[in-house]
């Protein structure tokens, strides 16, 4: 019989890692709540047309990477490859902009058929932020600061913020024609992928990872030289705001992002510790997406962070699981019942309690308690039950005297024990 395994690029999140993910998500919830953001959750499966219209038919995501299929009703459906288009669709469908600008965040799995590698899987997870209905450059700076400070809250320090201006649609159209002419004159010097992109999506060539093409592009026309005065003013003001916020940045004139809906501000936060997959966070302004999907004209800006890459960068510190406050050891039928009762009482006070279910000897249960890294062991045997007493033994700080590591108390004193344990946690 064939052993069933997960599909390539679809990774199980095991208990040893899940607590680290929960910690990151709890930091996100607290951080975004302080920023006045509200969470939105959208379906994993959407109509394929949403992404072909929203992301762009000529992008790599739509052309090569989407998981698309026809359902039993003959409708073309796609596992979402990113979150912004789904959020935009939901805003339009439910008329959320009738209530004013929307400041939203989301989280969840996304799907792209790519070659799996560290930090890039076919099912991957994102946390993202979207400001919809806000045109001000101040909103650009705030969105970037939320990403920057969130990553700092998670414990990431060695990061680089890269910014660029993609200008308006008019700016880009003029630049595209100039760039295409320049590239066509050097067609034979380009790598194969770039040759295919010249007439389809020439801006993506600026982001080529091919070394010879990158060297050639150092002499290419720059989008910054084709920006209107209005676009230049926006970009200059963004830089001024970032300086005021004490957020260091670098200008990367070849930063274009991979999706067609971006305009004006584009940015990435990168790390040198991720190898070729250096981008931790990417985003930008998308002023035409909402109207493209049938909604009103609604200037917007947002970003997404890849959870897998964030967890890799955070390292062992974020993955450390929380140790129990108390490991409950028991032996005997009556002791078992009392152990369950007290475990539930302690948990109701927000203490982390692990109850032993093995029924093995006290010595083996103590070994498991030590392995759990619990601070205390609560010991309940038949003798303790008959005497109406409970025994607490300190499992850590073993350098202290034995007497200070052991406490005997009655069940009626449980409230005092709870207060003691809570005080220790603070």
From Swiss-Prot:
Main location: cytoplasm
GO aspect biological process, one term: histidyl-tRNA aminoacylation
Enzyme Commission number(s): 6.1.1.21
Any one GO cellular component localisation term in the record: cytoplasm
The family this protein is said to belong to: Belongs to the class-II aminoacyl-tRNA synthetase family.
Subunit and interaction comment: Homodimer.
Protein name per UniProt: Histidine--tRNA ligase
Organism, scientific name: Prochlorococcus marinus (strain NATL2A)
Lineage: Bacteria, Bacillati, Cyanobacteriota, Cyanophyceae, Synechococcales
Gene name for this UniProt entry: hisS
